[in-house]
Regions:
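Conserved Radical SAM active-site core
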Residues: 1-4, 17, 35-115, 119-120, ...
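N-terminal pre-triad scaffold of radical SAM enzymes
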Residues: 2-29
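Flexible, glycine-rich phosphate/dinucleotide-binding loops
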Residues: 12, 108, 165
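Glycine-rich nucleotide phosphate-binding loop and flanking beta-alpha elements
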Residues: 75, 139-140
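Short, conserved loop/helix-junction motifs that constitute active-site signature segments
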Residues: 124-127, 150
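Receiver (REC) domain switch/active-site residues of two-component response regulators
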Residues: 130
């Protein structure tokens, strides 16, 4: 897996101050995507053990609320396979920090057997996330008043509450 950028002290992609990892590779190709260069799987730099260590160090200060995964597309199967062991490490090292993930796929697509994004890593990766921002960006539904998303079809799913209740629960800050 390659990544486009690591943003330290990001305040745009989740609550509080965060570290954000923008992965490379996306087959969704949303019209008016704000990072179309990340569609290419070979864009940016290789995600290496040294990259993981750098992110873990960036996450360590108390003022960092958590990690956000975006892209590109974290839920492309080849990206999930690399992200899963990394997210396990983050969760083990920082159990009180939140992990958010933005995806152009819907939560239902991620759960549907045979769908493009679903693979052997999907369920466990979802189990390690706190919030999933799901759905493709749709220019006609653009709404700049929304927090942490660009169009009104996208949802902020509280995955912890969703797991507890068995039905989709939306995040409220």
């Amino acid at each position: 897996m390659n990544y486009a950028v690591i943003k330290n002290c990001d305040i745009a992609n989740g609550p509080g101050v965060r570290v954000s990892l923008f992965v490379s590779g996306c087959t969704n190709h949303c019209e008016h995507c704000f990072q179309p260069q990340t569609w290419a799987f070979d864009y940016g730099e290789p995600f290496t053990p040294q990259t993981e260590q750098t992110i873990l160090e960036l996450l360590s200060p108390d003022y960092i609320n958590g990690l956000t995964l975006l892209g590109g597309e974290p839920f492309e199967p080849e990206n999930q396979r690399v992200l899963l062991p990394f997210v396990r490490r983050v969760r083990a090292a920082f159990p009180r920090k939140t992990i958010w993930c933005f995806t152009g796929f819907t939560y239902d697509e991620l759960l549907t057997e045979g769908s493009h994004p679903r693979c052997e890593a999907t369920d466990e990766l979802l189990s390690l996330l706190d919030v999933l921002v799901d759905g493709r960006y749709v220019e006609e539904l653009k709404d700049i008043s929304l927090r942490f998303r660009g169009s009104s079809n996208q949802r902020l799913i509280d995955l912890n509450a969703t797991r507890q209740t068995g039905s989709v629960q939306l995040f409220s800050s």
